[in-house]
């Protein structure tokens, strides 16, 4: 018996050779592989396959998955494939073909009475986003981020303090302890960065031992060559990452001075274009160094006709500047350059900028990391055409390049890729389901550690789950001890060895960062291009390997107003 390709897609979702449009963009992905055995697909529902003696077998709980996502279209850095995904004990247990091995062939994921089912037919499945530029200004950010599809937040802060409004720093052991304790309340993987701006090792070491998973160098605290050198030395000793916001005013040196202070050691450069801060006008040069792991923040993503205007006011507020002081205004204006922002679009498309993050409430929007990543990808396809690596009629490589920017690459950079950042067996089951029409904008379901933490949900008093008003609501994995079992608090190995979780009474699962100091740009997947960057000091024009980088600002973006009418 045969059915039409359209009927098959309607029933089980797209299969090999089918193409799917991502939201209202011009990006199209094509299914590369389908793990199913045609005719043996499993699907739940009345009169469907996953019933006792059919697709569901008789095995005990130990031998079947806890949760099965059926027939989902996976988009990840490693591929665009159709598969069943099995989850066991909060981790991804299998990617393959589900069913009853007693009666079905080629089953790699056993289904039993202990198995819950989530229908993935016609849905896109991605790893939860990893946002590594968080100012922890208010706890409400965490819900905003979760509902956008972000499941890991890394950064610093203590609340709406003036220092936190400007810098991603949780300074000192006392503040670190309070923030670690607070993080127990949220269905989000969280890691904190300490203050890196000091010229002697002691104050840095005590922060790492208190739980910091990294150290942040910020110009507002004084990012001098001495502070950079000291911070990187401590990071090398304790295997934590260093993030840097460089010296916009070039007071203690120019970009060449800062790059020399790195001494070829690994460092994560925040908003490497410079509008978010950094050596004016040429911090963008840093993306050509093999030891530099470059990221963007989302307000400049992508370059539009409104980008310049909104940035000036943003900057004055976030960095405690006074519009009545001429020097403060000049400082702000030096950071906002059309030419370098336009170049940033293209450098992302070339894979020279490797990551994208938010800069939450401090010149960035915490709920728009994923959306702005795909808006940038769409703008670049429209302006630059298909990438050479893309197949005929699809944007698969571009999709893999861009999804890596907010999933696997930030996870690799901060030493947590053994736990999160991709859909791979053994990793924490932080997964996001999307309807293709709403991809990147509004997820349908967010899983944390294999349990549903948030979802679109209709009227709770209705007779079915779907009546309006439909909006995002926290689900059971956001409450009680389930929250502690399904989310991670990341700390340093030194803090783990010192017994910090026990001392502070932390209840969430503990993740330990590792491998931070050996990462090089060549390790950042699909985003490892090392261009030779030149910036004209008069015109701010940017060239990469001798080629001028310029693109027009967008007047209209996809994934925008038509999705936010209410």
Swiss-Prot record:
Q: Which Pfam families match?
A: Amidohydro_1, Urease_alpha
**Protein modification:** Carboxylation allows a single lysine to coordinate two nickel ions.
Instruction: Report the GO terms under cellular component.
Output: cytoplasm
**Active-site residues, as the UniProt record annotates them:** 319 (proton donor)
Q: Which cofactor does it need?
A: Ni cation
**Residues given in the record as Ni(2+) 2 binding sites:** 216, 245, 271
Q: Which residues form the Urease domain?
A: 128-566
Query: N6-carboxylysine-modified residues are where?
Result: 216
Q: In which pathway does it act?
A: Nitrogen metabolism; urea degradation; CO(2) and NH(3) from urea (urease route): step 1/1
Cite the entry's keywords alphabetically: Cytoplasm, Hydrolase, Metal-binding, Nickel
Query: Known EC number(s)?
Result: 3.5.1.5
**One of the protein's GO biological processes:** urea catabolic process
* Catalytic reaction equation(s): urea + 2 H2O + H(+) = hydrogencarbonate + 2 NH4(+)
Family named by the database record:
Belongs to the metallo-dependent hydrolases superfamily. Urease alpha subunit family.
Protein name per Swiss-Prot or TrEMBL: Urease subunit alpha
Q: Which organism is it from?
A: Pseudomonas syringae pv. tomato (strain ATCC BAA-871 / DC3000)
């Amino acid at each position: 018996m045969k059915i039409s390709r359209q009927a098959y897609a309607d029933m089980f979702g797209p299969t090999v050779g089918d193409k799917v449009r991502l939201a209202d963009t011009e990006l199209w992905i094509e299914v590369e592989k389908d793990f199913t055995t045609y005719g043996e697909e499993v699907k739940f529902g009345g009169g469907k396959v996953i019933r006792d003696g059919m697709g569901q077998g008789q095995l005990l709980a130990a031998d079947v998955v806890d949760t099965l996502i059926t027939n989902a279209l996976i988009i990840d850095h490693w591929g665009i494939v159709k598969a069943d995904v099995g989850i066991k004990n909060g981790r991804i247990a299998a990617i393959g073909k589900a069913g009853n091995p007693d009666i079905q062939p080629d089953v790699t994921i056993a289904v039993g009475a202990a198995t819950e089912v989530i229908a993935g037919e016609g849905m896109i499945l991605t790893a939860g986003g990893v946002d590594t530029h968080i100012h922890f200004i208010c706890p409400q950010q965490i819900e905003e981020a979760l509902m956008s599809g972000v499941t890991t937040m890394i950064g610093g802060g203590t609340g709406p303090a003036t220092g936190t409004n400007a810098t991603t720093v949780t300074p000192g052991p006392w503040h670190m302890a309070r923030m670690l304790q607070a993080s127990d309340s949220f269905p989000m993987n969280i890691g904190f960065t300490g203050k890196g701006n000091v010229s002697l090792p002691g104050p840095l070491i005590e922060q790492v031992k208190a739980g910091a998973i990294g150290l942040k160098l910020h110009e507002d605290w004084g990012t001098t060559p001495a502070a950079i050198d000291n911070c990187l030395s401590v990071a090398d000793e304790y295997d934590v990452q260093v993030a840097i916001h460089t010296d916009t005013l070039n007071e203690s040196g120019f970009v060449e001075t800062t790059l020399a202070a790195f001494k070829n050691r690994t460092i994560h450069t925040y908003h490497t274009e410079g509008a978010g801060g950094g050596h004016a006008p040429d911090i963008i040069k840093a993306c050509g160094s093999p030891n530099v792991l470059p990221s963007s923040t989302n307000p400049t993503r992508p370059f539009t006709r409104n980008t310049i205007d909104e940035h000036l006011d943003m900057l004055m507020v976030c960095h405690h500047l006074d519009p009545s002081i001429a020097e403060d205004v000049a400082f702000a204006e030096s950071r906002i350059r059309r030419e370098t922002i336009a170049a940033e679009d293209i450098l992302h498309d070339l894979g020279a900028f490797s990551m994208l993050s938010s800069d939450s409430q401090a010149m960035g929007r915490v709920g728009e990391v994923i959306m702005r990543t795909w808006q940038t990808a769409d703008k670049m396809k429209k302006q630059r055409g298909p990438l050479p690596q893309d197949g005929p009629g699809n944007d698969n490589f571009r999709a893999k390049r861009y999804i890596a920017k907010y999933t696997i690459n930030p996870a690799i950079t901060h030493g947590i890729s053994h736990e999160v950042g991709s859909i791979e067996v053994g990793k924490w089951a932080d997964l996001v389901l999307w309807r293709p029409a709403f991809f990147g904008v509004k997820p349908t379901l967010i899983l944390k550690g294999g349990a549903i933490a948030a979802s679109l949900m209709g009227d709770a008093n209705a007779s079915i789950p779907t009546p309006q008003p439909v909006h995002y609501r926290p689900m059971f994995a956001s409450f009680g001890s389930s929250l502690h079992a399904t989310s991670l608090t990341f700390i340093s190995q030194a803090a783990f060895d010192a017994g910090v979780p026990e001392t502070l009474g932390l209840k969430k699962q503990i993740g330990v960062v590792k491998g931070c100091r050996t990462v090089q740009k060549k390790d950042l997947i699909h985003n490892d291009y090392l261009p030779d960057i030149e910036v004209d000091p008069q015109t701010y024009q940017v060239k990469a390997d001798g080629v001028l980088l310029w693109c027009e600002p967008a007047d209209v973006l996809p994934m925008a107003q038509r999705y936010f009418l209410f």
